[in-house]
Swiss-Prot record:
Family of this protein: Belongs to the isthmin family.
Protein name: Isthmin
Keywords: Disulfide bond, Glycoprotein, Secreted, Signal
SMART domains in the record: AMOP (SM00723), TSP1 (SM00209)
Subcellular location: Secreted
Biased composition (Low complexity): 27-53
Organism, as annotated: Xenopus laevis (African clawed frog)
GO CC annotation: extracellular region
Region (Disordered): 27-55
Amino acid sequence: MLRLAAELLLLLGLLLLTLHITVLRGSPDSSSNSSHSLIQNEPSSDSFSFNPSDRQEYLDEATRRAFPKHRLMTSGHTSLQRDGTGSFLLDLPNFPDLSKVDINGQNPNIQVTIEVVDGPDSEPENEMQKENMPSWPVPSPDWRSWWQRSATLPRMNYGDQDYKYDSTTEDSNFLNPLGGRNRQVPSHRTFDTKEQPEYDYVDGEGDWSSWSVCSVTCGSGNQKRTRTCGYACTATESRTCDMPNCPGIEDTFRTAATEVSLLAGNEDFNATKLFGVDTDSCERWMNCKSEFLKKYMHKVANDLPSCPCSYPTEVAYSTAEIYDRIKRKDFRWKDASGPKEKLEIYKPTARYCIRSMLSLESTTLAAQHCCFDDSMQLITRGKGAGTPNLISVEFSAELHYKVDILPWIMCKGDWSRYNEVRPPNNGQKCTENPSEDDYLKQFQEAREF
């Protein structure tokens, strides 16, 4: 039985070999293809012959050369090697064994290329570049700049660049301590010069925008400008702006100044008569209670805002509006913690002070003066408490000195007597500060001095 099967296979092989030779002889390209023929090595191309051993070598050579490796097509299947347009060869000895093929597995010999073309006029070079480009998006320059800024942002120095306190004097506040406190203070910059201030920002940030329009059309207001400082970050800088005096305010101030001149009892304001050097000038000042002074003090009490219970940090940067819940309107305030107001002399226990600003609605030239301790709490009594100024330094520094500062000097720094005439404001009923024990101690020291 096995012998019969072997003979059948042998006959089948001979049949296929005969068919193979017949196809080779009948191919029109066999004579022109040197890789599939051995005729090129013969001296003559008209005829050829070979013995049985040569015949076997010829068949082996033809089998090896007539079937190159299968080419891979983009359509996903393998094509058979063709010798011509009308014939094909079936390479049974090299035909792969399909009995153990996994139909569900992926074919590693299949390559698929997906190409996206924008238009019919796209050039081949562009198509090749698209095939070789990575699939992830390329970061934009803005994103790269933000990354560089974010990486270096913790190293930025904000001490000399943000929120410049606008002042033409060497004033200071809680962001800019006094020089006597052994702290290194950055130099102030004024906005009166045309030269732009220098900043220590890292490269890559946007330019400063132009200054905004002044917040008021007359009087004193503020301006702002911004710049980008990274992702979802905007730096803001502000400064004060002084516009022309509002219409009618000159008449208001002139009338008030005339009334202030009556504080001495005559129309010619004479501070020498009011604060004459005698045995007890403080007592004389305390007993000066004219009818006009009473009316003026009543106007001051009704016109001025109440002191806030804690230091409003927004005034440290520039003039700020703060809502007064008792008067039910906004008042403008300015920091008054610097040497210009002589804080360390007249209010020795105060750390910060603020002063209200004049407005067109003001019926007097007075200003509210409030002082705070190291914890930013309002000082309601004692030698560090702020007292109302009958003449605001904003209107006249000279008159302010004569009306508000000289009485303190005449009383030789006895705040207990001074505060009897100019009581500190606590209209918002803030917690009494300092404590009762500290207050009594300060009071006793003032009497003994």
